[in-house]
Amino acid sequence: MSEAANNLAVSLFSEILAVDQLARANVARVLPKGMELSHFSVLNHLAHAGVERSPAQLAKTFHLTRGAMTNTLHKLEWAGWVHIRPDWDDARRKMVAISPSGQSARDAALAAIAPVIADVVSKVGEDKAKAVLPVLREMRLKLNQVD
């Protein structure tokens, strides 16, 4: 790879990492009291999936260790936002589903997050946001293939 290509790659990933850090901070600031960004991410995933997931499946989805996911799931269960039950086919496994209060908490978080995100998109411009989305999606897919 040429020096110019290396410089482009470093600049691009530096911007992506900076945007990620700032986006997380701004989103975390408006989440409902007691909800962390990791909690919202899991609740949002379960709400979209519409089916139960095992802790191992969730850990893989979020590129976390099983221990880290178990910790997050215990916090979500304690808050009443997920139901964790034994897997009827394999007693060694558990299955996780979003609870009605978890769905409500996720909806409240989404309602708080949406204006923050929409404001940034508005300031950048919808056309620019639409133009960069396919590139970011392709980069995500390429990076996911590395795993």
Predicted regions and their residues:
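C-terminal regulatory/oligomerization modules of transcriptional regulators
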Residues: M1-A4, D127-D147
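N-terminal leader segment of winged-helix/HTH proteins
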Residues: M1-K33
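N-terminal positioning helix adjacent to the helix-turn-helix/winged-helix DNA-binding module
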Residues: L8, S38-H39, S101, K128
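Hydrophobic structural patches
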Residues: I16, L43-L46, L136
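Alpha-helical linker/hinge and terminal dimerization helices associated
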Residues: I16-V19, A23-V27, F62, A105-V124, ...
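N-terminal helix-turn-helix DNA-binding core of bacterial DNA-binding proteins
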Residues: Q21, A25-T65
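Charged, amphipathic alpha-helical coiled-coil/dimerization segments
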Residues: H74-P134
